[in-house]
């Protein structure tokens, strides 16, 4: 490169010194020098990737029907498409967890579903709330059978254990602030 502020000629072109160029002209000049260096080395100094046009053939206009046999272009059932999408995107675990809540009655039976409902599912532990302590006790006894029914419906590993609770007991706490009192008293005697 020339360090002076004089113009010089290179290959028939008059080249301005770098000190007089600024902004876009300086960038354009650097690009031209890089292209010239690439051409001097025998490389293709392209102006970006250009896809050659594909010649148009008359056969491209003909419609390709799927024919009498099954084809990937045939209409698919919505359930199959949704299942394939969930599997492809890695949503299978979340969909299985949602099925526990959505199909609770069909998984455990109508009688149990009338008296207990799922509340949450965290790390494979399904929290179930029963409408009475008697139903909570009965569900704790049936816990192994419930886990087997759930695993048969949504697959193994989705629900690993059950946390069964009864209805909440009445609370005497009032307001957002609480100071520890003297403990429970005999209020019913």
Swiss-Prot record:
Residues 59-78 are annotated as: Disordered. Pfam families: DciA (PF05258). Belongs to the UPF0232 family. HAMAP family: UPF0232. This is UPF0232 protein ML0004. It comes from Mycobacterium leprae (strain TN). The lineage of its organism: Bacteria, Bacillati, Actinomycetota, Actinomycetes, Mycobacteriales.
């Amino acid at each position: 490169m020339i360090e002076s502020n004089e113009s010089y000629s290179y290959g028939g072109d008059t080249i301005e010194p770098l000190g007089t160029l600024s902004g876009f002209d300086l960038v354009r000049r650097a690009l031209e020098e890089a292209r010239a260096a690439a051409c001097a080395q025998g490389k293709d100094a392209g102006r970006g990737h250009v896809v050659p046009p594909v010649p148009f053939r008359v056969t491209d206009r003909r419609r390709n029907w799927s024919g009498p046999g099954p084809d990937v272009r045939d209409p698919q059932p919505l359930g199959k498409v949704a299942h394939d999408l969930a599997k492809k995107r890695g949503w299978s675990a979340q969909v299985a967890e949602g099925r526990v809540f959505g199909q609770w009655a069909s998984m455990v039976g109508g009688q149990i579903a009338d008296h207990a409902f799922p509340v949450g599912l965290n790390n494979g532990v399904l929290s179930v709330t029963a409408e009475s302590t008697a139903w909570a006790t009965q569900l704790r006894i049936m816990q192994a059978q419930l886990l087997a029914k759930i695993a048969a419906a949504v697959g193994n590993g989705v629900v690993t254990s059950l946390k069964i609770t009864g209805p909440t007991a009445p609370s005497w706490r009032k307001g957002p602030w609480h100071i520890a009192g003297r403990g429970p008293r005999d209020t019913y005697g």
